[in-house]
Amino acid sequence: MAGADGAVVSSSSRQRAMHVVIFPWLAFGHLLPGLEFAQRLASRGHRVSFVSTPRNLARLPPPPPALAPRVDLVALPLPRLDGLPDGAESTNDLPSAAFELHRKAFDGLAAPFSAFLDAACAQGPGSRPDWVLLDSFHHWAAAAAVDRKVLHL
């Protein structure tokens, strides 16, 4: 549980801290609730890797100082595609006609996300992700979690 300042207040010393990876869709209606959930998990002593693109991460409010050590912002650069406007990393940055192109660029994050999971799993106990939380747009990410024996939702 968190105190008024966001500091962690443990309700049970027997609870094992988890490492949760959260990778929301690249829209602020998904990013902001995902970040709020990340901070709630961190306030309960869990470690969170919050994955998005560099520009989206830069536009999010920073976690409170007491939680910042437990919330790792992981930047995966969105691949550039012909026809996709420069800097278009969120659906806010796009006309609706470019939505499918944005999804195609997003699919280009499959290999970098897998590499991130490989690195996180290689760090061993305490750093290895326990859970990967995904949006429905991540049709390739569940397989990446399964391949590494990480639970996903």
Regions found by a protein language model. Name each.
Residues 1-153:
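Glycosyltransferase specificity loop/lid
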